[in-house]
Amino acid sequence: MQINLAIIEHKEKKIVPVKAYMPFEMYGYKFAAHKAYSSDTWNVSEFSTGFSVERNCFTRAKALEKAKIRLETIGKENVLKAIEYAKELLKAA
């Protein structure tokens, strides 16, 4: 299982696949933990867009815990808006 992340590196946009772990669903979308592209920390992103929910955690468990809290705090409406915005950015890339 992998997530495709949109990365801007040296003013160049590219899509980078990263291995995803422990997926969970919320608000009709699937999220999972993955290692950060350029460091050894853990992030949580949405599958279809790579929309980052939580970043730079030292453990996978903490990244998942913090991501779920963040998603609940932000609320369904705002999460869905952010995912739609991420989809538009991917189309433009």
Which residues make up each language-model segment?
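Short, solvent-exposed coil/turn segments at beta-strand boundaries
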Residues: 26-30, 47-49
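Short, surface-exposed beta-strand/loop "edge" segments at domain boundaries and coil↔beta transitions
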Residues: 12-16, 50-55
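Short aromatic-glycine-(Arg/Gly/Cys) micro-motifs in beta-strand/loop hairpins
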Residues: 36-52
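Mixed-charge, Lys/Arg-enriched low-complexity segments
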Residues: 52-93
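A short, sequence-level motif marking secondary-structure junctions
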Residues: 21-23, 36-38, 57-62
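Negatively charged, low-complexity tracts enriched in Asp/Glu with abundant Ser/Thr
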Residues: 1-27
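Short linear motifs in intrinsically disordered
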Residues: 12-14, 30-37
